[in-house]
């Protein structure tokens, strides 16, 4: 089985349950159904994107995020919204490639990047619509920072944040050029497991607290709505 490019969300799903990852992202046997929370998050991201990119007025329900966006707009530099980035491994080195390149190894989409090449830095912002930052994971920021260093070779420092707009909380992380790919060493064991699963074509179920009520893979015996 050919290895497919992975993303932060895809690897997170594989870490939770390889079978769920396979059925949803590889076999695609489960139709994607947007929950109300997902719909809200997508609408919020879209509103923020067009406010930043085109100065389009925010819908009334998202007016509360304007102070955050205005502060970001005051930062000097070139802005990129919903920027798709990817990398490939060629000659044992990480290299830039097109997002849809068949040889892509890792993909990521950044909500907002502001580059200030004169100061060799970039600002990275990922908007979150959750109610709390209590379980925030900065791995996503580290992965996006690695992509930024490849796609913007003049950047030597990435200052990033998870911006929880509803909770009014910010989780910050800073990355430097010399340790730009450290995140892949941190994820090495999970990435080896992912490759082994593709090589063998075996994606085993991993029973967890989400199986009974929240998993969409109803053909799994651990699902609360299991059906053959």
Residue ranges and their predicted role:
Residues 1-228:
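RecB-family 4Fe-4S metal-dependent nuclease core
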